[in-house]
Curated annotation (Swiss-Prot):
Domain of life: Bacteria
Pfam families: PNP_phzG_C, PNPOx_N
Organism from which the protein derives: Citrobacter koseri (strain ATCC BAA-895 / CDC 4225-83 / SGSC4696)
Gene Ontology MF: a single term: FMN binding
Name of the protein described by the UniProt record: Pyridoxine/pyridoxamine 5'-phosphate oxidase
Keywords: Flavoprotein, FMN, Oxidoreductase, Pyridoxine biosynthesis
Name of encoding gene: pdxH
């Protein structure tokens, strides 16, 4: 198959979105109410990793980067995730706290985009979550100097076994280089696929401690 033939095949990959629409009268006043409903439906549908979200940050040169991270908590204060504080995303957020999150629930023909500013979590919040993780995951947090270059996977595996022996007694301590961020939500956009590419999009935007809701063209 030539490169041109392959491109033609990709160009024709499409499907109709038929699962249903989203109407203004169906929207709650608070975006997290709708998010909770949609997340619950994603869980009920047994989607793989329904809390997985694409996290977008920007470096000092304006170059955007994305990666998939798991949402670990949300409430009226914002959305929370955890990471190695030496990671690329953590360094980006230290210099520029602007951030975007995307929940791609393809099977439900939905996506939710969140934009706002990220702030570091308190040590108390981080410790509480860290010790709720499986013990091997706690040890794994010690192993990796995230985003640094390594020559082989065996380095990680050897370090894991070494630390598992070291921490076999008692509680695994919280690494000083491990923490979390809370995304203070400024906007949330809900997208529902529609027939003939006439998708439904609604934008919640915070204004004066209230939420303004607008329908956007698809």
């Amino acid at each position: 198959m030539s490169d041109n033939d392959e491109l033609q095949q990709i160009a024709h990959l499409r499907r109709e979105y038929t699962r249903g629409g989203l109407r203004r009268n169906d929207l709650p006043a608070e975006p997290l109410t709708l998010f909770e409903r949609w997340l619950g439906q994603a869980c009920d549908a047994r989607l793989a990793d329904p809390t997985a979200m694409v996290v977008a940050t920007v470096d000092e040169n304006g170059q955007p980067y994305q990666r998939i991270v798991l949402l670990k908590h949300y409430d009226e204060k914002g959305m929370v995730f955890y990471t190695n504080l030496g990671s690329r995303k953590a360094h980006h957020l230290e210099n520029n706290p602007r951030i975007s999150l995307l929940f791609p629930w393809h099977m439900l023909e939905r996506q939710v985009m969140v934009t706002g500013k990220a702030e570091r979590l308190s040590t108390l919040e981080v410790v509480k979550y860290f010790h709720s993780r499986p013990r091997d995951s706690q040890i794994g947090a010690w192993v990796s100097k995230q985003s640094s270059r390594i020559s082989a996977r065996g380095i990680l595996e050897s370090k894991f076994l070494e630390l598992k022996q070291k921490f076999q007694q008692g509680e695994v301590p919280l690494p000083s280089f491990w923490g979390g961020f809370r995304v203070n939500i400024e906007q949330m956009e809900f997208w529902q696929g529609g027939e003939h590419r006439l998708h439904d999009r609604f934008l919640y935007q915070r204004e004066n401690n209230a939420w303004k809701i607008d329908r956007l063209a698809p």
